[in-house]
């Protein structure tokens, strides 16, 4: 399920770049509006197909906790778009892939949840990798995009930590709220919400991709341990960067390759270790 979701999500970054580059009148806010709006509509449609007459109740039941999670989700949706626009796709995806580490940090701050020594070591190594990636952007606008990517990872940390706190909430409708929040903010900031007809297909594809992939990612931890989900998620960084290289000829910098390798390998090994520890505890 998670692998399928990640594979579907992989072209997302390239679609953002293709839409944003289509016309000088289309700015990042325009892209964000359509991304958020179609995400909200797509997820709401999935909720309706499952719950039918209970759809409105499902949205009402998310409560204040769901709205708070939706807020952080909406902010991360926005910062992700700006990250992709202002820095290389490889840089953005590598930095955003540190989400699991950000979750551990936010959980420590908000929930006073203690992390193991292995996790703290992983954090240090990951931040070294991020430093290497971002050091290659110093002096250019790419550094702005790198910071947006870092904010996205932090917002993801808040989103998933609060998801664990409010674990009884149905998170699929919350995804729709996040998209709606992003769209509402963007509509007031965009120069125009009109888009060239040649990118309509890209926009629709973006909405479908987000709706399906994030809905699957949201429910995946119900069927497999979170650590195992974490082992799969870095796959998006690799696939997304390769797709960008192939379609828009954007080659990763040496800093991105070195720093990205450090980050991805560390995240994979940490998730692998966590999975093994969880399996050992189950056998006791």
Regions found by a protein language model. Give the residues of each.
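Transmembrane alpha-helices of multi-pass small-molecule transport proteins
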Residues: 23-75, 102, 155-159, 175-191, ...
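Glycine-/small-residue-enriched transmembrane alpha-helix faces in small-molecule transporters
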Residues: 1-32, 71, 79, 138-165, ...
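Loop-to-transmembrane-helix transition segments
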Residues: 1-5, 54-79, 144-152, 187, ...
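C-terminal transmembrane-helix exit sites in multi-pass transporters
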Residues: 80-82, 99-121, 133, 238-258
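C-terminal-most transmembrane helix of multi-pass membrane proteins
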Residues: 36, 135, 234, 238-284
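Helix-helix packing/entry segments at the starts of transmembrane helices
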Residues: 92-98, 163-181, 211-246
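Hydrophobic/small/kink-forming positions within alpha-helical transmembrane segments
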Residues: 10, 14, 44, 70, ...
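Hydrophobic transmembrane alpha-helices of multi-pass small-molecule transport proteins
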Residues: 43, 73, 115-135, 154-156, ...
């Amino acid at each position: 399920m998670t692998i399928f979701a990640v594979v579907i999500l992989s072209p997302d970054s390239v679609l953002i770049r293709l839409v944003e580059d289509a016309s000088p009148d289309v700015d990042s806010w325009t892209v964000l509006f359509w991304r958020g709006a179609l995400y909200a509509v797509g997820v709401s449609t999935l909720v309706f197909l499952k719950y039918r007459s209970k759809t409105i109740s499902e949205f009402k039941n998310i409560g204040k906790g769901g709205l708070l999670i939706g807020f952080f989700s909406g902010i991360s949706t926005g910062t992700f778009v700006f990250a992709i626009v202002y820095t290389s796709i490889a840089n953005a995806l590598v930095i955003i892939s540190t989400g699991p580490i950000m979750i551990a940090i936010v959980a420590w701050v908000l929930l006073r949840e203690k992390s193991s020594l292995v996790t703290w070591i992983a954090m240090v190594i990951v931040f070294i990798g991020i430093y290497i990636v971002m050091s290659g952007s110093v002096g250019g606008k790419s550094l702005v995009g790198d910071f947006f990517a870092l904010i996205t990872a932090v917002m993801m940390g808040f989103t998933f930590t609060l998801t664990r706190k409010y674990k009884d909430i149905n998170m699929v409708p919350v995804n729709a709220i996040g998209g709606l929040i992003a769209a509402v903010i963007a509509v007031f900031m965009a120069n125009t919400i009109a888009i060239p007809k040649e990118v309509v297909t890209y926009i629709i594809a973006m909405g479908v991709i987000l709706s399906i992939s994030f809905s699957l990612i949201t429910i995946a931890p119900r069927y497999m341990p979170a650590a195992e989900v974490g082992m799969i998620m870095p796959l998006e960084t690799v696939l997304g960067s390769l797709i960008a290289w192939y379609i828009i000829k954007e080659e990763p910098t040496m800093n991105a390759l070195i720093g990205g390798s450090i980050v991805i390998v560390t995240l994979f090994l940490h998730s692998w270790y966590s999975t093994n520890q969880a399996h050992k505890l189950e056998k006791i």
